[in-house]
């Protein structure tokens, strides 16, 4: 097997995953944009403060990621307390996790495994993501900014 063939073989499942993710997003009846065959930007409706949820269909996982806030907004003195609160939130909201990306933004992330993927699994992953966004903006953001 040539190297090029192996690369093509590695890309086929992701392409299939991309089509699956697109179909599930359509079934959710939500607005989204396609970015080539690599990602989707979902624009959640009603009562959600965030503007975009990025959906990354990969070979093994379909990952949802949202930037929640720029951590440069936080006072440097209170960051340790903020990080502790985020770790506790990770323990409370086991379906999702909070993290920090390369641009120093607080992110929310969760994923569904491609193996055994179904519309119900994808929908549960999406709903958990929305619930965590709501939790962050209703219960955490103001507290974090006060630290």
Please describe what each predicted stretch is.
Residues 141-147:
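Short, highly charged C-terminal tails/helix-capping segments
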Residues 51-72:
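A short acidic-to-branched-hydrophobic micro-motif
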Residues 95-127, 138-141:
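Well-ordered alpha/beta subsegment
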């Amino acid at each position: 097997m040539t190297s090029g063939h192996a690369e093509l073989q590695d890309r086929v499942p992701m392409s299939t995953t991309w089509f699956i993710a697109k179909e599930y997003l359509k079934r959710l009846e939500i607005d989204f944009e396609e970015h080539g065959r690599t990602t989707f930007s979902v624009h959640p409706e009603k009562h959600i403060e965030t503007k975009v949820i990025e959906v990354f269909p990969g070979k093994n996982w379909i990952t949802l990621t949202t930037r929640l806030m720029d951590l440069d907004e936080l006072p440097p003195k209170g960051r340790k307390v903020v990080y502790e609160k985020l770790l506790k939130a990770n323990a409370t909201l086991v379906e999702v996790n909070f993290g920090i990306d390369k641009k120093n933004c607080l992110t929310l992330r969760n994923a569904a495994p491609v193996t055994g993927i179904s519309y119900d699994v994808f929908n549960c992953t999406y709903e958990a993501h929305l619930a965590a966004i709501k939790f962050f903006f209703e219960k955490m953001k103001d507290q974090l900014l006060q630290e």
